[in-house]
Regions:
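Non-catalytic, glycine-rich low-complexity segments
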Residues: 1-35, 109-110, 115-129
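Conserved, mostly hydrophobic/aromatic
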Residues: 29, 139, 198, 225, ...
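Aromatic- and glycine-rich beta-strand/loop motifs that create alpha-glucan
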Residues: 33-78, 89-102
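Hydrophobic faces of well-ordered beta-strands that scaffold small-molecule active sites
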Residues: 135-137, 206-208, 252-254, 342, ...
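Substrate-binding/active-site clefts of carbohydrate-active enzymes
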Residues: 140-205, 211-337, 358-364
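Active-site-proximal helices and loops of the catalytic beta/alpha 8
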Residues: 242-251, 259-260, 265-276, 330, ...
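Aromatic/acidic polysaccharide-binding cleft in carbohydrate-active enzymes
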Residues: 443-471, 490, 497-529
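Conserved small/polar residues in nucleotide/adenosyl-binding loops
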Residues: 532-538
Length: 542
């Protein structure tokens, strides 16, 4: 007998997947004739609502001698998530059609269970056209290329690593702290020098990890949003990078770090670098004081995941919101420099109101501006801080970092069951709005994950420490096997819906476990040439 319902087949549900508000959905269920169903109802509720609404099915004939067909329509008129299921009144009492694990195949049960998700997004929601069919390339600026230009730096509290091919400093200092203060001096002019290389690879978008002034080499501890870090160059260097990239048909997007700043910043100024009596830590009359959440000023304050160097900001503070999203704020200023959009760090920690304001700022400057959020799970039904998030409903993000696809692809390459992998992929395709699917940021590696080659071919990390990670290197046989499997992974990456993203150096055979081993410098002149085709859309022809 056929299954009663399958939400991923258009025989049972049209249209497939997420829908615009006001779209009528036609549903069909198949029921055993010997169940003697007297009435069938579609049960629907809006997200967190407690009350279910019921819509009657009509009997529409028989599928075969043992199966009958029932059909109904439903029209969601409000954006958000809906949950639906099926209630049957039969000769034998109440029965329910419910999704059953592990592959979403439905069964008829005597009690209600899980429901199916329906995503309803804003009518007219569109996403930028330019990412479609292109390739994104992620660059950690300190580690991609050094232009050779020496900077006139006033800062002295950092370590310059003169061996481009060395491991980043991974051991703690004498105080037991990891300071991330070793720099390889990669810069914006160095990226500009390599634009021809990126164009040749087929890159259409560069995603830059943070470039604003900061203490650390990763620059997620912003010191001054308005200035490019002097080690990277100047604001003019960024303007020139965007202009030169545009000549080659390449867009540039920046990393927006707006859930926290650095403690060593002009805004907080714990260390006094920006003056003796400035910043929220040193002056309660500071214009930035209201940005932060002090329990007991100055030393007891909210910080990101307990890191005292990353004080959290109150994103709903009017002064902070104006500074970032205002008419002359940071978002618009960089868009005017030539920036084509933003990747938002820890998007699940940014309030809806803030992201709505940011979207308005971006789209007013450039209707084709691209906004990507860092979300590790299914972003359509993500909850954070006790609330359902509205990332993909047409009022906040255009796209998210698609870690669900990444995990599924790499799991498959490591031998995971194909049905399980397919279910992970199809759940995203079913739950995400079509405008989002076409621009999903599909990465196999990022600055926050192990390199794809290491995941596929190396020993599992299994919580091993940095000492162990520092001493690992793939053997010849591991690398050979990893090459073949990486081709498979990239083939999937390029053929699934979305905007494939290459993490710098993956195409050159870089390996590495967790930070900082996944952040080594691009191996110019030492590339593993068998990998250089991996960013090309012709991967399946190789």
């Amino acid at each position: 007998m056929p299954v009663p319902f399958d939400s991923q087949k258009i025989y049972y549900r049209t249209p497939f997947g997420a829908v615009e508000e006001g779209t009528t959905i036609h549903l069909r269920i198949l029921l055993p004739r010997d169940l003697h169903t007297q009435r069938a109802d579609l049960a629907v509720k809006y997200d967190y609502d407690y009350n279910w609404e019921y819509f009657g099915f009509f009997w529409c004939g028989t599928f075969d001698d043992a199966t009958e067909i029932w059909e109904a329509d439903f029209t969601p008129n409000k954006i958000g998530l809906y949950w639906y299921g099926f209630k049957l009144q039969t000769k034998y009492g109440l029965r329910y059609i419910v999704p059953s694990d592990p592959y979403n195949i439905s069964t008829i049960e005597t009690s209600p269970g899980r429901s199916w998700q329906l995503t309803c997004y804003k009518k007219g929601f569109t996403t930028p056209k330019w990412p479609v069919g292109g390739v994104m390339y992620q660059i950690l600026p300190d580690r991609f290329n050094f232009s050779g230009e020496e900077k006139n730096l006033t800062r002295t509290d950092f370590q310059r690593n003169t061996d481009w091919y060395a491991l980043p400093q991974w051991w703690p200092n004498e105080n037991g702290e990891i300071t991330n203060s070793d720099f390889f001096m990669g810069d914006l002019k160095g990226i500009t020098q390599k634009l021809d290389y990126l164009e040749e690879l087929g890159v259409s978008c560069i995603y830059l990890n943070p470039i604003s002034e900061a203490y650390s080499n990763h620059r997620y501890d912003t010191g001054d949003y308005s200035k490019v870090d002097p080690i990277l160059g100047t604001n003019e260097d960024f303007i020139n990078l965007c202009a030169e990239a545009k000549k080659r048909g390449i867009h540039v997007i920046n990393d927006g770090v707006y859930s926290h700043t650095g403690s060593d910043s002009k805004y907080f100024n714990r260390n006094g670098r920006y003056g003796e009596n400035t910043g929220a830590y040193r002056d309660q009359n500071s214009p930035y004081y209201s940005w932060y959440k002090f329990n007991n000023w100055p030393n007891d304050y909210h910080s990101w995941w307990g890191f005292y160097t990353l004080p959290e900001v109150n994103e709903t503070d009017p002064k902070f919101n104006e500074y970032i999203n205002g008419k002359d704020g940071i978002v618009r200023t960089y868009m005017r420099y030539g920036n084509s959009g933003w990747r938002l760090d820890v998007a699940d920690e940014l309030p809806d109101e803030f992201m709505e304001n940011l979207r308005k700022a971006v789209k007013e400057e450039d209707p084709e501006g691209f906004i990507v959020g860092e979300v590790w799970e299914d972003a359509s039904n993500k909850e954070s801080y006790g609330a359902r998030r509205k990332f993909l409903l047409g009022e906040e993000l255009d796209s998210v970092m698609n870690y669900v696809f990444r995990n599924a692809i790499l799991d498959f390459c490591r031998g995971a069951d194909a049905k399980y992998v397919m279910n992970q992929i199809m759940s995203v395709i079913e739950n995400y709005p079509r405008p989002v699917l076409r621009v999903l940021m599909n990465s196999l590696s990022t600055h926050d994950t192990e390199r794809a080659l290491t995941v596929i071919a190396g020993e599992p990390l299994n919580g091993r420490d940095r000492q162990w990670q520092a001493n690992q290197k793939l053997s010849y046989d591991q690398r050979k096997r990893g090459t073949a499997l990486l081709k498979l992974a990239v083939g999937m990456q390029y053929t699934l819906p979305g905007f494939p993203c290459v993490y710098y150096g993956d195409e050159a055979g870089l390996e590495g476990y967790r930070d900082p081993f996944n952040r080594c410098c691009y191996p110019w002149g030492r590339e593993a040439v068998s990998y250089t085709h991996l960013t090309l859309p012709t991967i399946l022809l190789v």
